[in-house]
């Protein structure tokens, strides 16, 4: 990477990390802490308050991605953390579950993932873009692991309101990063001719990638409905689950070197298909374990979590990299907005699907469904065309 590419990658990854740390700190404790608020005895309302963030984010990803094409990436990126901070402050000051719900909805309105990834694509060459995207994905995975360890400790001292206050402070720190560290946009991007969002939806390979991120996050969130219970059955109490997740996440980052090697050899499509197959293998393994009737063991669950994070992190890096290469530069923000919209909808669908499947079909039925979804995804992605280094009018 050049110094400019390195600065852009690190600063934009930090923006993601600050935002996602705030989100992840709240998630492990939200359902329990929300019960202490008036209205918190309604499980449906608690679930809505948790999920409303993903819904408002999904609605606004595409419009804000298109706005970044028209008005500039950094303007939109500054706006996002400010809105997110306002939502966090509202949630911190809330005295009822309804107030928490409104705050969470406003948090989701700060949907800048598309603008951030579009700016990262603008400021990196195709040859190093997957590495840059992996830095963003890795920062998110690391924040997830940190939050699993820190959330229970922080909640015991500052409560849910304090966590939202901390989230607000992290978001404002993100604004400072945008203003004083993220490199300026190039005149080439600001003066580029504008394209049509229809160009995005007419591209079959972009549609495959959009479908892919929807399935990936549907499967991912569905998994977490059942996996924690399996870890408890294996003898690991809830406050020690990080002892499985943290090593799995960290070791999966080491395995990312293989992805970069395949990218350098022009085999990113092969890496993508291999990662999907890895996620499929994990779903089959978890399903077989759940259906066997035997007590799960950490010696089986630990390696399965490692394999899942290897596949998940590879897909989180390679898919947006491919979107940015395939999309014409004038509609790159719209393309990544569409991609992030489907990602958010996948998170929303995964929570709903996972809960319903565990209730009506148990863990074996859940993993059978996620395995079928992943297998269909692999089949539909197989015709994906190899991408040249200069596709999409890259940097």
Q: Where are the regions that the model predicts?
A:
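Cytoplasmic helix-loop-helix junction between adjacent transmembrane helices
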Residues: 103-140
């Amino acid at each position: 990477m050049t110094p400019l590419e390195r600065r852009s990658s690190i600063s934009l990854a930090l923006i993601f990390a600050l935002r996602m740390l705030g989100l992840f700190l709240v998630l492990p404790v939200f359902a329990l802490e929300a019960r202490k608020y008036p209205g918190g005895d309604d499980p449906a309302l608690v679930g809505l308050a948790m999920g409303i963030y993903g819904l408002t984010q999904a609605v606004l990803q595409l419009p804000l991605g298109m706005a970044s094409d028209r008005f500039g990436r950094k303007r939109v990126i500054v706006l996002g953390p400010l809105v997110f901070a306002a939502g966090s402050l509202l949630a911190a000051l809330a005295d009822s579950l309804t107030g928490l719900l409104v705050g969470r909805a406003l948090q989701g309105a700060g949907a800048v993932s598309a603008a951030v990834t579009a700016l990262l694509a603008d400021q990196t060459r195709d040859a190093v873009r997957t590495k840059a995207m992996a830095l963003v994905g890795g920062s998110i995975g690391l924040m997830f692991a940190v939050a699993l360890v820190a959330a229970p400790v922080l909640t015991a001292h500052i409560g849910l309101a304090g966590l939202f206050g901390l989230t607000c402070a992290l978001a404002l720190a993100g604004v400072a990063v945008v203003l004083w560290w993220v490199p300026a946009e190039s005149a080439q991007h600001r003066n580029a001719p504008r394209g049509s969002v229809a160009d995005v939806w007419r591209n079959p390979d972009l549609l495959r990638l959009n479908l892919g991120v929807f399935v990936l996050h549907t499967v991912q969130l569905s998994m977490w409905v059942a996996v924690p219970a399996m870890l408890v059955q294996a003898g690991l109490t809830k406050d020690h689950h990080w002892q499985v997740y943290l090593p799995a996440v960290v070791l999966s980052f080491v395995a990312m070197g293989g992805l970069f090697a395949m990218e350098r050899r022009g085999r990113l499509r092969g890496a993508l298909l291999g990662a999907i197959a890895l996620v499929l293998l994990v779903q089959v393994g978890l399903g077989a374990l759940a259906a066997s009737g035997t007590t799960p063991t950490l010696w089986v669950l630990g390696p399965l979590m490692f394999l899942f994070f290897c596949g998940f992190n590879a897909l989180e890096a390679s898919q947006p990299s491919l979107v940015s290469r395939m999309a014409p530069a004038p509609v790159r923000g719209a393309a990544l907005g569409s991609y992030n919209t489907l990602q958010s909808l996948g998170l929303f669908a995964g929570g709903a699907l996972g809960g319903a499947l565990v209730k009506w079909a148990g863990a074996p039925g859940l993993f059978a469904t996620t395995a079928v979804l992943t297998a269909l995804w692999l089949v539909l992605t197989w015709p994906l065309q190899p991408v040249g280094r200069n596709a999409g009018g890259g940097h």
